[in-house]
Amino acid sequence: MGYEYRAVTDPDTLHPLEEPFGVNENDPAGVYEPGMKTGAMVSSFVNACTAQTGVPVVGVSCAKGGSAIAKWLHGTPYYQDAVRRARKARAFLQANGYIIRHSAMVWCQGCTDGDLHTPKDVYKADTERVLHSFMQAAGAQACILIQIGNQRDEPELYLPMQQAQEELASEQGDIVLVSRQFKTFAAKGLMKDRFHYLQPAYNAVGTEAGRNAAAYWNR
């Protein structure tokens, strides 16, 4: 079972999880992209995770498509908005008697850095800073990392970002890589353009990621 905490539009209650997840959670001072959220892997992630753990999940949306890692560094509007939303969710749950068993961020980012030719070492260092700074500020125990896929027409373009993600998960015990499937979908015809995927692809990644996140928490 899953719920959404709407930190921007309705912060005084929980809503049953539905897609598009976070469709109206737009803050002009932070993450703001009206009309851009048309599909997601959140429901499949939550369903797969709760099937293994038996513990309900509360999700908080703060996703911004097409954003480079530099836009998420400590002190930026996106970073501050994400921390603000996470803290509001935690405060709401605690004030209403919920027991928070696990707290994590789910992260899937890097395609824009591939397009921008961000050097791998810069991307890796900035990503590590963003993830650990956010986890500390938001009280999250882990980062559930979903590896990005490939640009459909230039499949080598995102390899440095993928390699950086592999290294971070190998080196950092609190960064958990839960899916590598996105890079397989171009060959399966599951991309709708050079950058985006069809909903069955998101469902497959969400399901795999949810199962592996549950295995991490159940270990």
Regions of interest found by a model, annotated:
Residues 1-219:
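Cell-envelope and extracellular/periplasmic
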